[in-house]
Amino acid sequence: MEAENHTTVAELIILGLTEDPKLCIVFFVIFLGVYIITLVGNISIITLIRISSQLHTPMYLFLSHLAFVDIVFSTSVSVIMLMELLGHGLVLSVATCAAQLCMTVSFGSAECFLLAAMAYDRYVAICSPLLYSTLMSSRVCFLLLGISYVGGFVNGWTFTGCVLSLSFCGPTQINHFFCDFSPLLKVSCSDVSIIGIIPSISSGSIIVVTVFVIAVSYIYILITILKMRSTEGRHKAFSTCTSHLTAVTLFYGTITVIYVMPKSSYSTEQNKVISLFYTVVIPMLNPLIYSLRNRDVKDALRKAIVRVYS
């Protein structure tokens, strides 16, 4: 009934990270640099994997798709955030806001599935090395990739459908730096008792399923490693899993807070900081996490540099 006493609006004002003009300039320079590093790092990973025959394995196939997902995921947020910092806020239509949220959620969810697929790949490689070529055949790899993207887009469409079913009557100022679901609910004049729960169930299901796959995979990996008699074998097995575990911990830790925990457990400013970390910072860190301690990537990079300058 309350919605009937207001005029429905079709535009939303995204306030951004700060309203301080001086801080806007500082943040613009910082996050433009972060975005450029993200693009260069992830494009370099994709290119290196494509041109290096020794990296044509399932693990690096998944890593190249993770890099692609990180590029789109970061771009869907960074471009809008940079425009806000330049213009001290940004006006978007509800449809544009919903489309941006769809991209962010879709590729963020796809990252969850890819991280689970990479954990399964490590499980097969360490626990069943003789069956690796069979269990991780091209058909299986592309099936896992298909599930990752389809599952991601289904979750994205769930969020989008919920947003498009909302009415916005004003005030339409969103205290965030991109169109995220929780801030949109706060400015809606619709009944959000059901709509607010559906995306949490959808995202929560993806997190629970993928975390279960990752946890079970690493439990079996740990058991197998502890049974190894060779110290060198243990070290090699651990080193192949360290980077992935680091990426998993960083990513799942932040998205769990945003999409699963009750919204009353953190403030709007804390929401901004956590969202900034998983949408902007983690996509920049992933290429470093997966390459700095990876001997195969270092060797492939060295050979690529030699080919270029020889």
Swiss-Prot record:
Q: In terms of domain of life, where is this protein from?
A: Eukaryota
Q: Which residues lie on this side of the membrane: Extracellular?
A: 1-25, 76-99, 155-196, 259-271
Transcription regulation as UniProt keyword = no
Q: Which residues lie on this side of the membrane: Cytoplasmic?
A: 47-54, 121-133, 218-237, 293-310
Read off the PROSITE patterns from this record: G_PROTEIN_RECEP_F1_1, G_PROTEIN_RECEP_F1_2
Identify its membrane topology class.
Multi-pass membrane protein
Disulphide bridges: 97-189
**What are the glycosylated positions?**
5
Q: Where in the cell does this protein reside?
A: Cell membrane
- What's the short name of a Pfam family annotated to this entry? 7tm_4
Family that this chain belongs to: Belongs to the G-protein coupled receptor 1 family.
Q: What's this protein's function?
A: Potential odorant receptor.
Q: What is the name attached to this protein's record?
A: Olfactory receptor 5P52
- What's the source species for this entry? Mus musculus (Mouse)
